[in-house]
């Protein structure tokens, strides 16, 4: 659409000049000749006719406008800066602003406004372009049919780019009606006229081809809108129309691949992408779209959804390389540094997708477990998309992951003595055991540089999380806000599946209430609530790591007050609040948070869309497994989460010298999990309790065996039934730190 918009606008301008009222026959002839020369591509002749018109009528700004457009097309649409400057001068000359458009006089200036909207569109100033386009749409009735369609198509494209799919569908319905009525009117005229003329039949065939092309374009826009709305049943119907009208062209196959991707048919989506003939595409110099870049990016997204993250990052890097090659070719044509938009076709101003690809790479690298590489990608992307709270959260997660041990390192330490015994010194009677320190809190991460410098530190993570909270709308920061129970799809708190995974269902009644979050999908009401919970949980963790216990307690309390809180984040909220309270010497309050009965659910709150996505499938058509797994740092069950609470509760009782209660908590927790799953912190707690009880030999045996003694286990098993009996066998999990649950 971007490539043919300027052509439409130029043709309309010249025709409008030729039909102006109160002109002489000479002016009318010059105007007609200029228009015909323009439509045939003879821009030199067109400019000559316009120069003659300018000599006759020097006060008509429309002639200057048409001259600027003709010169723009003569340069192969490479003088965008000159056209933009001329449009601004003409706008100041007619003393009109978009907000003041309210009369027929402004309708006469519609070409000027439309041209300005097209320029804004290519400069990615979509909000301003929509403002101009919507003003034009108010006066669409007096416009000629072709120009009215151009305005509508421009607005549809802008609505889809800004994720306003409902508005786009409304305009597409208007366009369908407009094309249908125009076709009927033409058929009526042809019936009354003489159709034996060869030129008339050619014109009729050409007109029919244009109508079919417009209908095909409408079907493609409908598919894009339905994909954004996740309305897959309606999308399936439109996909058939697209394939019937556009055939196996690259755009139609890409749309169908996107549709199959949303349905979960990832292999079919890959097959459709591979079947597209990219070589037949006109190229980015004519369309502004780098199809190879889109191809690799789409493959990366599909493999990300399949949890094949290493393959995904491979394809994203290929897309980045392709994008950089294209940008290098485009920058080679620019000679004047003062005119950054000139020297290349205007449509190529939309070609560069570097920052969108960097965003994708960052999310992919974060899932792979390479937080530093992910940080480098996202910190570059945030310079462009600095108003995206989700992006700031991802940056903070990179900092958190970079400043804690990896999952493999943490898991390797559990079955060995490395997590308990640091070294052994001395010999014989003087032989001593040096226990490993488990304290990782209050670490000074800053090495003297400003925390505002973008490095993957915990101080910078705190800044990122503060930015994310400030970017959330104020109405979402009220925990007493109405829950909005009509939303049917609840999404996860702290995991991002893909760029489209967090898009709300079209069934939501709050579909038009969202905040933009480019380059990913916009944040709807329910997603904002989930996002805020994730930000608060991360903020509490970072504050604890930095030793800011009051701030950590504040964030944890706010997290627990949220009306829609997943079980896993509620579990984290209680643990973070308890740790902050213990550091503040408010142990009694901490014990309240560490009550195992507080844990009734450890779900991530992710509600898959499989039912909605699979509802339009055939009976024998199965949904592919995405292979997604819940993060291993979360307890796998309520039982294991309560075990963590009991271990921490035992620590709290030790601080109050209530050793009997601490021992009871330890034994109760140990009876609920496999001996190999007991974390080193729990073994150290048992050693501490035995030393306090004067049982030095028993403490040494615990250290030697690296597990709780069988006698201790037997004592708890004597009871007929544990307090928290596991319903099913507990799978091995990665236990968190003793009073800190680390999270990805």
From Swiss-Prot:
This is CCR4-NOT transcription complex subunit 10. Residues 183-199, 496-506 have a biased composition (Low complexity). Residues 1-25, 183-204, 477-521, 602-634 are annotated as: Disordered. One of its GO terms (biological process) is negative regulation of translation. Component of the CCR4-NOT complex which is one of the major cellular mRNA deadenylases and is linked to various cellular processes including bulk mRNA degradation, miRNA-mediated repression, translational repression during translational initiation and general transcription regulation. Additional complex functions may be a consequence of its influence on mRNA expression. Is not required for association of CNOT7 to the CCR4-NOT complex. Residues 1-16 have a biased composition (Basic and acidic residues). The modification N-acetylalanine is found at residue 2. GO terms for cellular component: CCR4-NOT complex; cytosol; membrane; nucleus. The keyword Ligase does not apply. Residues 74-107 form a coiled coil. Keywords: Acetylation, Coiled coil, Cytoplasm, Nucleus, RNA-mediated gene silencing, Transcription, Transcription regulation, Translation regulation. It is found in: Cytoplasm; Nucleus. Its main location: cytoplasm. Residues 484-495, 602-612 have a biased composition (Polar residues).
